[in-house]
Amino acid sequence: MHRIAITNVTGGRNRGCEALVSSITEGLISELGGDNLRLSLHTQDPVYDREHFGSVLNATYSPSNIPPSAMAPRGQRFCYFAAKWAERTPLRRWVPRSVADGLKADLIIATGGDTFTSDYRAFAKHARVLQLGTPVAMLAHTIGPLTAPDEKRFVASTRYIALCTVRESETLEYINHIAPHLQPELTADVAFLLPATAPHIARNIVEVDNGFFIGKRRLAGLAVSTGLLSYRPDVDVDRYVTEIAAFVDDLNSSGWSVLLIPHVQETWRKNNDIYACRDVIRRVRAPLENAVLYSPMSSSDFKGVIGLCDVLVGSRMHTNIAAMSQGVPTVAIAYSRKARATMRDYYGAAVADQITFDVTEIDRHRLRAAFDHALANGTTQSRAAEMRQLALQNFVRVREFLQR
């Protein structure tokens, strides 16, 4: 029996996180067998996730605030050593349940895609898991850019990292520079393996659950992020919404209908995409030609709906991956380097630079030019298949480690 703890998860209401957790659990079960696994999830949304992932998880924990994230790595390691000792005594009642689970695990899978960057100003909090003393697998990460203090902390926290795979070449180069002893391997984001809801069901989700008749409409998907406005103070909110709405108007005038995709719906309003999608739809000239997908949907449901579209324009990483994994032409609105790096690996630099741009550069004309370029570039099913094979290697490496 292999005990695996999946950590550093915001929660399944963030459908990008849900896509990661679902893909990881499916990948582990496929590679190792479900009867041979005990899976736990450490999440900031334990009540929701306990129900949402309950069929595949044995336990769900809320992360502990002990030890403090500001403590030096050496001090954190001492705290966890003390907790491990306490687990063998009556003092174990004082050890946080999430800490006890991490200490007992055979392997920790530290997930989150780009959790281990400085973009969200929470690196130290997430890096505590690297000090537990349990082997850690970092699967298909974007790591960095890190501030100087965060980079110093990361380099001082690598002793228990047993496996490091990365999802794009820029991270590979960065880790080979700052921590070559980790021997990073380039794979692909595990969400390339996420199953998509079947087309006929996805169509019903749009038409029945959301009341938008597709008929012979030509569909474009548009994932509008509320969250990036919190992480990028240099973005003008009004311009962001206005230019996206004008782009939708332009598509409508060309015979397209747009499905607005609120891929992240956290309880924290500043990271709930329904608000940004609503603001956009309120500004378009022909709102009834488009739809915001308000109904409850899983990450697989969103992926199935994206598969109905001819093009996806996304400011959320895992909507873009949902499109690329199906060969759907994709435009990336980037708020960090992860989008550009992933697009370059998938499409090649020449194409990626035409269909990827920073959110501060957003305007209706640039959006339309990128959209037309992506459409002309065509579908990419063969590249999608290659990426799925690379994503499978993450779980092959986990199996090889556990069977040593």
Label for each model-derived stretch:
Residues M1-R404:
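Active-site anion-handling motifs in enzyme catalytic cores
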